[in-house]
């Protein structure tokens, strides 16, 4: 494992614990031996107030490669969400998460999670990743928002 990646992720964890947006979660997972795995984080993004996503808490896994922060983490909703920019596998399609697009090593975990929260309610229809959600979003916004509200209710924190 890269010392650069681990040191950056340790800084990220410290900064997150000191200050993070209300309702968001970002925690490194534990290895079988109980030690912390900084390369694999369990996160959760709350649906934004005043949107059909409100009330939901959407679980996301963030996986970092050894060359982080040169390369972005892979962000994957578990379980996958109904959304035009979420692949059926759950992987998020967002330009700041793509090395050859808008990724920059200075982007923080907090910025990534806030960017994904923004994307939930403002899909990028130029870059669809899920045919069904994309089609319904474009053709029947009322039905799309109904499905999103049902999903938010399903993923409401207990």
UniProtKB/Swiss-Prot annotation:
Phosphoserine: residues carrying this PTM: 71
Effect of residue 127 to A: Impairs catalytic activity
Residue ranges of the TM segments: none
Cellular component terms per the entry's GO annotation: cytoplasm; cytosol; glutamatergic synapse; nuclear envelope; nuclear pore; nucleoplasm; nucleus; perinuclear region of cytoplasm
Enzyme class, broadest EC rank: transferase
Active site: 93 (glycyl thioester intermediate)
Site (Interaction with RANBP2): 4, 25, 57
Pfam family, one: UQ_con
A single GO BP: ubiquitin-dependent protein catabolic process
Subcellular location: Nucleus; Cytoplasm; Cytoplasm, Perinuclear region
Cross-link (Glycyl lysine isopeptide (Lys-Gly) (interchain with G-Cter in ubiquitin)): 18
InterPro entries reported for this sequence: Ub_conjugating_enzyme, UBQ-conjugat_E2_core, UBQ-conjugating_AS, UBQ-conjugating_enzyme/RWD
GO molecular function terms noted in the UniProt entry: ATP binding; enzyme binding; HLH domain binding; RING-like zinc finger domain binding; RNA binding; small protein activating enzyme binding; SUMO conjugating enzyme activity; SUMO transferase activity
Sorted UniProt keywords: Acetylation, ATP-binding, Cell cycle, Cell division, Chromosome partition, Cytoplasm, Host-virus interaction, Isopeptide bond, Mitosis, Nucleotide-binding, Nucleus, Phosphoprotein, Transferase, Ubl conjugation, Ubl conjugation pathway
Pathway this chain belongs to: Protein modification; protein sumoylation
Interaction with SUMO1 as annotated region, ranges: 13-18
Cell membrane found in the keyword field: no
Chain ranges of the UBC core domain: 4-157
Main location: nucleus
Subunit structure: Forms a complex with SENP6 and UBE2I in response to UV irradiation. Forms a tight complex with RANGAP1 and RANBP2. Identified in a complex with SUMO2 and UBE2I, where one ZNF451 interacts with one UBE2I and two SUMO2 chains, one bound to the UBE2I active site and the other to another region of the same UBE2I molecule. Interacts with SETX. Interacts with HIPK1 and HIPK2. Interacts with PPM1J. Interacts with RASD2. Interacts with TCF3. Interacts with NR2C1; the interaction promotes its sumoylation. Interacts with SIAH1. Interacts with PARP. (Microbial infection) Interacts with human herpesvirus 6 IE2.
Role played: Accepts the ubiquitin-like proteins SUMO1, SUMO2, SUMO3, SUMO4 and SUMO1P1/SUMO5 from the UBLE1A-UBLE1B E1 complex and catalyzes their covalent attachment to other proteins with the help of an E3 ligase such as RANBP2, CBX4 and ZNF451. Can catalyze the formation of poly-SUMO chains. Necessary for sumoylation of FOXL2 and KAT5. Essential for nuclear architecture and chromosome segregation. Sumoylates p53/TP53 at 'Lys-386'. Mediates sumoylation of ERCC6 which is essential for its transcription-coupled nucleotide excision repair activity.
Protein name from the UniProt record: SUMO-conjugating enzyme UBC9
Biological source species: Homo sapiens
Recorded name of the encoding gene: UBE2I
């Amino acid at each position: 494992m890269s010392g650069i990646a681990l040191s950056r992720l340790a800084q990220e964890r410290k900064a997150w614990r000191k200050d993070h947006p209300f309702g968001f979660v970002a925690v490194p997972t534990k290895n079988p031996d109980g030690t912390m795995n900084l390369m694999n984080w369990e996160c959760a993004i709350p649906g934004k107030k005043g949107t059909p996503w409100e009330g939901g808490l959407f679980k996301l896994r963030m996986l970092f490669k050894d060359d982080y922060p040169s390369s972005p983490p892979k962000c994957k909703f578990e379980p996958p969400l109904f959304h035009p920019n979420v692949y059926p596998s759950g992987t998020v399609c967002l330009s700041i998460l793509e090395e050859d697009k808008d990724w920059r090593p200075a982007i923080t975990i907090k910025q990534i999670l806030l960017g994904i929260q923004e994307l939930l309610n403002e899909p990028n229809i130029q870059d669809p990743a899920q045919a069904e959600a994309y089609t319904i979003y474009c053709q029947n916004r009322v039905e799309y928002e109904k499905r999103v509200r049902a999903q938010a209710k399903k993923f409401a924190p207990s």
